[in-house]
Amino acid sequence: MAFLKKSLFLVLFLGLVSLSICEEEKRETEEEEHDQEEDDKSEEKRFLSLIPHIVSGVASIAKHLG
């Protein structure tokens, strides 16, 4: 009987450890995805801030050609 209790506790302990590891990996993955989204947003903002300069450059070129 004691052997069965020890085995059961061992199985439960190993299950909790593996669950904890999986949750930690999931949390790290979510943080990496969040960081990637923030990087993408900042790149998009930088690109959008360049659009007025590009438009004015194209307009001045068109004015010189036209």
From Swiss-Prot:
Record keywords, A-Z: Amidation, Amphibian defense peptide, Cleavage on pair of basic residues, Immunity, Innate immunity, Membrane, Secreted, Signal, Target cell membrane, Target membrane
The protein's name: Phylloseptin-S6
Segment forming the signal sequence: 1-22
Protein family: Belongs to the frog skin active peptide (FSAP) family. Phylloseptin subfamily.
Main location, first listed in the record: secreted
Leucine amide: residues bearing it: L65
Classification via Pfam families: FSAP_sig_propep
Any one Gene Ontology BP term: innate immune response
Reported tissue expression: Expressed by the skin glands.
Region (Disordered): 25-44
Entry function: Antimicrobial peptide with high activity against Gram-positive bacteria, low activity against Gram-negative bacteria, and moderate activity against fungi. Acts by causing bacterial membrane disruption inducing leakage of the intracellular content followed by cell death. It adopts an alpha-helical amphipathic structure in membrane environments. Also shows highly potent antiparasitic activity against Leishmania species. Shows moderate hemolytic activity on human erythrocytes. Is also active on human monocytes.
Gene Ontology CC, one term: extracellular region
Subcellular location: Secreted; Target cell membrane
Propeptide regions on this chain: 23-46
Residue ranges with Acidic residues bias: 30-41
